Amino acid sequence: MKFSENWLRNHAPIQANRDVLVATLTAIGLEVENVAVLGEALDLILVARIVNVVPHPESDLLQICQVDVAQDTLLQIVCGASNVRPGLVVPLALLGAKIGALTIKSTTLRGIESNGMLCSAKELGLDTEASGLMELPEDAPIGTPLADYLALPDASIEIKLTPNRADCFSVRGIAFDVAAACASEVTPFHIDEIPAVSARTLPVELHAGANAPRYCGCVIEGIDPAAPTPVWMAERLRRSGIRPVSLLVDITQYVMLELGQPMHAFDVDTLRGPIGVRLSRNDEALKLLDGRTVVLDNDFLVVTDADQPIALAGLIGGWETRITDTTINVFLEAAHFAPAAIMGRGRKLGLHTDASHRFERGVDPALPPQAIAFATRLILELAGGKPGSLIHVQLPEYLPAPASILLRRTRIARLLGIVIDDAEVERILQALGMQVTTQAEGWRVVAPSRRFDIAIEEDLIEELVRIRGYEHLPTALPVGASHIAMPSETRLDMTSVRRQLIARELQETINYAFIDAELLRRWQLNTGQVMLMNPLSAELAVMRPRLLPGLVAALGRNIARQLERVRLFELGNVFTASDEAGAAPLETRHVAAAVCGDAFALQWGEQVRKVDFYDLKGDLESLAAASGAVLTFHSSAQPWGHPGRSADVWCDDMCIGWIGQLHPALTQTLEINVDVIAFELALEPLVRRALPRAHALSRFPFVRRDLACVVPEHVTWSELAITVRDVIGPLLRDVKLFDRYVGKGIEPGFKSLAIGLILQDDTRTLIDRDVDDIMTKVVMAIQQRHDVRIRS
């Protein structure tokens, strides 16, 4: 939000100088990002009129001007500006004036004496982009100091607003906070009722319920289309970052900046009536003010004329009903549109307007009648005309009601640790525009309709300390002995998880907890979504149900930047909708990884090959080994996984995640042209671990036996391993798959697996007969359960 310092002081009559004002704004939460000082050194610069212009005899680029500054004689000025012409009113720097580092002196240019300098706005520090001489209105008083005429010096102040302070998107909204912080009060603002002169009106129909509960308007006939924007208004707009366009448009912008209510003006002669507000219909088309024709879906709020769209409510007007240079009859609109009805619609069309910026965050629902009256008064004063009566249509049941809150003295003292005098509490709250009624235990406070962010007692206490100053809160060191908790040995902490994954050459990624609904649709994760009511953007409108979509998107961006070997992991929360109506979403911590490219960094001692399922499975198993979690892997049917190259991950008889190669169809839609291997698991089962116990090493030798078996293709290695462990029990120290073969000598539908078993007893040496008995049991079990044949 950018505004003029002088404009703010008109609403908040404070004595503080500019430096104190800037510091105060930041201290009360309205962070100042930039201050552009305007017109501090305009001595000896006057308003002048060019009386005569003749070409310079020695230069095609210079003109000789005779200039009137209300002195006895005309001044001769040599000028090279492209827009110099007789009758033009411009700023003139007299001899001795300073413009930046330049002091104006009498000089001779190509043999012609010049006794001053005609100035551009850029040279005077009043604009950053202007070219040519600064053109002033024809009625500007000649000989008047420019600083007096333009109400200078001034400053253009730009502040950064948090989303909850939509009320400060107006000069008057900011003034309430500044006045309260500086022990002052805002200047009263009242517009007298304007009597109707014209009988012309338009019927209004509201068909959008809570999306548009209030609509105000006024018809004004017979305005002067050639009336210029007065310099005081044009300068306030410029210093607020808005370029003047035409009087009617400038008045709507001016009212928006001063009061905070976006407005729109229609050429009433292009309207038939009735005016309506409704949701758009699929495939409705509308030509916008920027010249584009857009096709709408059924999710836009539109203003209609005879049920035909003429504007996108809260966004932008339509081409057919626009104000032109010949408009003499106008219909002013000021309405209250709900933030949810405007939010994200502009981004769908690539639009961002001052109106949508305000409506998305919330506009005072009580403002429309006041804004119409103010704009009507300005038009009558500056362009004449005959006003009609105020049109005011509303749906009271949908209008938000101001919060009425009990503020207790005891609660203030408990939260802040200090006692604030009753008089100070009442002064601050009343200066902020709140209605305050004294009660036995404190005050009954009604928040102003512009303050959507005030709903509970703590909000009021925050206002007190914000305006009074956080520096007045007591500073106290913690009392009592500090307690340093030892890390639990039954849990693997997050630092250890990160270190383990980093040791496996994975790099940590931190993504938003929000994600694009369209991306989830591609992953077939578009059920049970947790939608945000006020998203940062349309692309970040859903709380992520899994880490992988965002993580793989980050991997894709790295690939697009010519990185071939990418290894990423992320630790974060995921969100799913609760089965209970009205309950908070379920929040679970997950760990995920995604890799692509070569298995190893390029070096002479390693064979070059692509990373595969088993590489990432090894990374996952190393993480599980750190906590002692026992993982098993079963074939998966997840839609984003490659069939045959992905698995569900189980721990303690519960499916906790997925690992595998992404489905080629998915990577193609994500515009990733390499194989991506990934996993994602719930973190809680991985970080739980039993209390570590020490075991003595066996004094007796181990025995290794190998089995070569032919196994049906559908039988997985994990199923075989589980059977072997069940049969052997505690004597089995390890079981490994060390070879897999498919091809000549193995019939179709089968595979050959070579298994190594390590057997050991802690109490005695295993003899051949013991081992043979065990191996016989293993062979019988796998033959019966899995239709396995032993190879000789």
Curated annotation (Swiss-Prot):
Residues noted as binding Mg(2+) in the record, renumbered to the chain: D453, D459, E462, E463
Subunit structure: Tetramer of two alpha and two beta subunits.
Name of the protein this chain belongs to: Phenylalanine--tRNA ligase beta subunit
Keyword hit for Protein biosynthesis: yes
Family membership noted in the UniProt record: Belongs to the phenylalanyl-tRNA synthetase beta subunit family. Type 1 subfamily.
Catalytic activity: tRNA(Phe) + L-phenylalanine + ATP = L-phenylalanyl-tRNA(Phe) + AMP + diphosphate + H(+)
Domain of life the protein comes from: Bacteria
Alphabetized Gene3D superfamilies for the sequence: 3.30.56.10, Bira Bifunctional Protein, Domain 2, Ferrodoxin-fold anticodon-binding domain, Nucleic acid-binding proteins, Phenylalanyl-trna Synthetase, Chain B, domain 3
